[in-house]
């Protein structure tokens, strides 16, 4: 939380903490790298189709940060179509990476940290059981005047129940078994749980 | 992070995570209590002079949450005066409570989570060495159209260097001593450090 030297830190635009070990922002530029170092990131979820810039890749290598790229196009014709440009399956894949604590601390970003990032954080909040009014309030806080009704509809209709049930099923199953297990048996259960988590990661609604 | 039942959670208005163990919001209402429970708060920093409502006090007692109240008046004549209504000494006292990890997880709130809360979070960001542009961006994200130039000036002119130096001095002193100390001597140092932290808590610029 506290810096030891007097160098002023510059977070990326639209930076914020989402939850413990989860951050969001617009595209990080080199002047933001000293700040990003303080977060001790383990991974970055990048939501644009454009290749990651070389100097950003260099920074990731130097900090041993894993890049998860989910190429979602920025919206082209904002007013001409009522359909969302956000693909559900891609956001679901990104959500699975996002809620896996082994990837934390993680930074989600797109270009401006408003729409694509806002949609992913929105479905995370639904996964966390937030009411829709609060999810929308948060989306709008970051999108401001650029808020899109299609994004709000995307978040509203996105189904997280199946994924949550799948995850809870696995956790509950092993939690119950491990309760009565010996130390050796617990290690075996751990390996089985890892395999089940692979299934969960390939979950499709 | 995850709820185990299907009850939808309703965070207070303008709720957000500020940093690890630090949250901000507008005034929490009873429908927000189930959500607040998930944060496992140890304390609340309340920035208004009005008495805390009985049902909120009841909730705090049931959850064993400590209340720190710093009565700062809401601004009355927004446009007639260039002076800030935020008292520096009070914000400094609140900042000292806020950065003390023994009070974490902590929720900061005022009435709407915009001005008084925005000023306290603003000086925290200066304490964390954030550049002023990023501090202002964050203030404005929550204040929106209600952003006040007097608040931004308050944050800009607030001096955190003295407090930081005082805190770092204590930490550095004991860190160095404890490095070479025996277990028994370390306990003694711990007691002395606690006393020094009292001095720090009474720090006045």
List each language-model region with its residue ranges.
Chain A
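Cys-dependent protein tyrosine phosphatase-like superfamily
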Residues: 1-108, 112, 119-205
């Amino acid at each position: 939380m506290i810096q030891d030297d007097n160098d002023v830190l510059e977070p990326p635009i639209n930076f914020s903490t989402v939850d413990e070990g989860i951050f969001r922002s617009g595209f990080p530029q080199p002047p933001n790298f000293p700040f990003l170092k303080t977060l001790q990131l383990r991974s970055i979820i990048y939501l644009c189709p454009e290749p990651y810039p070389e100097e950003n890749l260099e920074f990731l290598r130097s900090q041993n940060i894993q890049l998860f790229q989910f190429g979602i196009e920025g919206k082209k014709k904002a007013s001409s179509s009522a359909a969302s440009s956000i693909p559900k399956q891609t956001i679901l894949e990104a959500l699975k990476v996002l809620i896996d604590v082994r990837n934390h601390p993680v930074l989600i970003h797109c270009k401006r940290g408003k729409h694509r990032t806002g949609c992913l954080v929105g479905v995370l909040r639904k996964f966390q059981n937030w009411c829709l009014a609060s999810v929308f309030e948060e989306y709008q806080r970051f999108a401001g005047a650029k808020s899109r009704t299609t994004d709000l509809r995307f978040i509203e209709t996105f189904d997280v129940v199946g994924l949550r049930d799948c995850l809870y099923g696995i956790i509950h199953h092993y939690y119950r078994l491990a309760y009565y297990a010996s130390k050796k048996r617990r290690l075996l259960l751990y390996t089985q749980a890892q395999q089940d988590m692979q299934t969960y990661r390939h979950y499709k609604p």
